[in-house]
Amino acid sequence: MSEQQPKAKFSDNERLKGESRFLRGTIAQDLQDGLTGGFNGDNFQLIRFHGMYQQDDRDLRAERAEEKLEPLINMMLRCRLPGGVITPQQWLGIDAFAAEQTLYGSIRLTTRQTFQFHGVLKPKLKGMHQLLHCLGLDSIATAGDVNRNVLCTSNPVESVLHRQAWEWAKKISEHLLPKTRAYAEIWLDGEKTETTDQEPILGPTYLPRKFKTTVVVPPLNDVDLHANDLNFVAISDNGQLVGFNVLVGGGLAMTHGDKSTYPRKASEFGFIALDDTLKIAEAVVTTQRDWGNRSNRKNAKTKYTLESEGVGAFREEVEVRAGVQFAPIRPYAFTERGDRFGWVKGIDNQWHLTLFIENGRILDYPDRTLKTGLAEIARRHKGDFRLTANQNLIIAGVDKKDKAAIEALARRHGLINDDATPQRKASMACVAFPTCPLAMAEAERFLPQFVSNVETIMSGHGLAEDEIILRVTGCSNGCGRAMLAEIGLVGKAIGRYNLYLGGDRIGTRIPRIYRENITEDEILSIIDDTAGRWARERQPQESYGDYLVRAGIVRPVVDSARDFYD
């Protein structure tokens, strides 16, 4: 097919990217404008390519409007952290910045296996980027129409294989980064050169839409590969990485009321040798760059390109561009996707402690000084921290002689909670209110008490030691990955959600809508009824989602492009 569509049809985002001078826009000038706390015009969108979103505190909107003040505009920054690995020294740097320079004082672990700062005012932005640079970090391409933070299976049980997978996650991230010098010029006072920027992979208008990549090590699907555009499934031989199965075209975002949008599982393309990894990654990205829909952003992601052009045609184009033929998919299987909490011994004789961080929000609470505790551990720990795609944190690489001291610190500060149930650990939410401008309903602030109510139901049916994969997302964009949950709540309005049921425990089946626009009480009543039936009628080891499908309570989504709305 032709590589270009008629220019008149392009969305306005294509115009602003093309006119941005390789993502510079007039961001530097806006930084000097003290009359507003935000960025104007195109810059509002362009700062996303630099890893930031412009937000405001929605709890304060009405009050500030009454006082004739503009909203409390602030920025959220998402760090680029391939595979979620961060050193204790880096952690201490971000800990201090969050405490001293942000409105909320917290560090937010996210489903993109990195951390976010929320509530950064415009005068603090340059110092924030320069701090990250000094720490060896950045936020390049963690938002916008680019390849975003690359996820990698984070549990280091198989340390050699995990290390190899993580090295490839870093290589893929670096290879697909924008080449523009705009970030360094604007935020790091980098030298402006006369050399014209080139973007050989992403192109002068970058990608049609955001693009997400994972490296996953079976049997753990902790990264939820089917939520991502490009996935490399590690294939090993005698514990050594030998290549990847490649899956393309996953994604969960949709638009309420628009049946041309839907979640989609990734399609299997085939197996590749390690040496072909970067060639295939580049070929998938450039094919999506040239074939993706640049006129309608709601249908611009890779999943829609595969449906419009055909999986076979897309796959063949990737082979041509890469000069690589896909071999048949090699056997792989997933058995779980949750994090393995507590101490796990690696094959290197070091120990790894996975901590449950509810909602990923690291802050000092009256009964749990999580932020202080992690800072104290960082001052003592000789290994690293690994953030997980489930919003939790691993203290990795602990010597046996240091285990007791690390655990004592974690317990003292409430980082280890023996009372946290399997259900609570299997539940997750996106940020939503008060900072996300897209949120239609609560998610992070709603989840803890909602889970308590679900726990009561589970206990009443003799299910206290069981779990249901439960996800809450504040809008249909899907950051909480509700469209791969056994129970998925998608915000519709304040206090109301669409309820999806019937996903599976390992993240390989999309749930189906069960009730639309219902209240918390209605949702809990449905969970009470279906969990009770599950307890009475399930087969040995049968999960909640699998039971719902077998019992005919929901029909499975088999081919979401065709049957998601049936």
UniProtKB/Swiss-Prot annotation:
* Cysteine disulfide links: none
Pathway given for this chain reads:
Sulfur metabolism; hydrogen sulfide biosynthesis; hydrogen sulfide from sulfite (NADPH route): step 1/1
Recorded E.C. number(s)?
Answer: 1.8.1.2
**One function term, GO molecular function aspect:** metal ion binding
According to UniProt, the reaction catalysed is: hydrogen sulfide + 3 NADP(+) + 3 H2O = sulfite + 3 NADPH + 4 H(+)
Assembly and partners? Alpha(8)-beta(8). The alpha component is a flavoprotein, the beta component is a hemoprotein.
Binding-site positions, siroheme:
C479
The identity of this protein, by name, is Sulfite reductase [NADPH] hemoprotein beta-component
State a GO cellular component annotated for this protein.
sulfite reductase complex (NADPH)
Highest taxon listed in the record's lineage: Bacteria
> What are the protein's UniProt keywords?
4Fe-4S, Amino-acid biosynthesis, Cysteine biosynthesis, Heme, Iron, Iron-sulfur, Metal-binding, NADP, Oxidoreductase
Q: What does this protein do?
A: Component of the sulfite reductase complex that catalyzes the 6-electron reduction of sulfite to sulfide. This is one of several activities required for the biosynthesis of L-cysteine from sulfate.
Fetch the PROSITE patterns from UniProt. NIR_SIR (PS00365)
GO BP annotations of the record are: cysteine biosynthetic process; hydrogen sulfide biosynthetic process; sulfate assimilation
Pfam families annotated for this entry?
NIR_SIR, NIR_SIR_ferr
The cofactor remark states: Binds 1 siroheme per subunit.
- Binding-site residues, [4Fe-4S] cluster: C430, C436, C475, C479
Q: Which cofactor does it need?
A: siroheme; [4Fe-4S] cluster
* Family designation: Belongs to the nitrite and sulfite reductase 4Fe-4S domain family.
